[in-house]
Amino acid sequence: MTIYNFSAGPAVLPKPVLVKAQSELLNYQGSSMSVLEVSHRSKEFDDIIKGAERYLRDLMGIPDNYKVIFLQGGASLQFSMIPLNIARGRKAYYHVAGSWGKKAYTEAVKLSKTIPFEPILLASSEESVYDYIPEFDEKEIDPEAAYVHVTTNNTIEGTSLYDIPKTNGVPVIADMSSNILAVKYKVEDFAMIYAGAQKNIGPAGVTVVIIREDMINEEPTLSSMLDYKIQSDASSLYNTPPAYSIYIAKLVFEWVKSLGGVDAMEKANREKSGLLYDYIDSSEFYSNPVRDKKSRSLCNIPFITINKDLDEKFVKEATERGFKNIKGHRSVGGMRASLYNAFPKQGVIELIDFMKTFEAENA
């Protein structure tokens, strides 16, 4: 039985990447050391981390005036690092279109009680369980504000922000954790991009930060570990980095490039997600909660049946058939198919076949 992993993260990795990692696990490039053992100060790891940055810059078209930093703590730590480093007593706007955007805003509010800055909720769709991307008038934004924070893909709710809104000249910071390298964005549209690795980049443990040089703090922050300038000046080696996660990320970047880059990934993702959305839309048994079809995520597709009991039955039977981790997030229920870059089109085809059978037996 073929297993298809629909996990929202940690997520499926490309099979060629896993095979190469397996081959280098015991003896990395003739060093007689496992890649798990090489020192982060060694030539071997220097080649790994520089190669990872080089491939990422090429894939995303990252300009020279942006720094790439490999950090720890997940994307969630960035919810604190961003205001600590960048807010500096100014206003900071938050566009909240999903649960993770809400967490970023909530963390900012918490920090503002001890650090001088003013987090402002710019727009939110929480009142309708984030089933659409909220709009705002850029004139509402103070042009002297530190930043506007957005989330480009909402893994739980299944929406995406494809067109970056105008912000009255204020720098845009994006949490791109779940659709980085899956959808093409212009890096210059953002002052900073950050992404946890465990969806389209690699295993959990490393967070990629792409930050324009003029956004990097000159004054020290509360902690050296949380200081973008210190981390950037140390070339991501202020302390021991998550070396193996960076190694896998490099292999994933190589794999993406070998298949044609981000353009090819987006094309494949549109094909995969389109198959599933088309079937759901044609069915009276299944439904997708996203109000605006143009805002539907290519990477995370939530859906439900006609009642919660059948949702539970679907998850149980799907899991038994090899469709793993298809249960929806605990906050919304139902099901969720996460179709990241490494997820095969054949898995979508077979899921749809199962959905048809389940509908015929339970409608």
Swiss-Prot record:
Its EC number is 2.6.1.52. Gene3D superfamilies: Aspartate Aminotransferase, domain 1, Type I PLP-dependent aspartate aminotransferase-like (Major domain). It catalyses: O-phospho-L-serine + 2-oxoglutarate = 3-phosphooxypyruvate + L-glutamate; 4-(phosphooxy)-L-threonine + 2-oxoglutarate = (R)-3-hydroxy-2-oxo-4-phosphooxybutanoate + L-glutamate. Its main location: cytoplasm. PANTHER family: PHOSPHOSERINE AMINOTRANSFERASE (PTHR43247:SF1). Disulfide bonds: none annotated. Pyridoxal 5'-phosphate binds at A75, S76, W100, T155, D175, Q198, N239, T240. This is Phosphoserine aminotransferase. L-glutamate binds at R41.
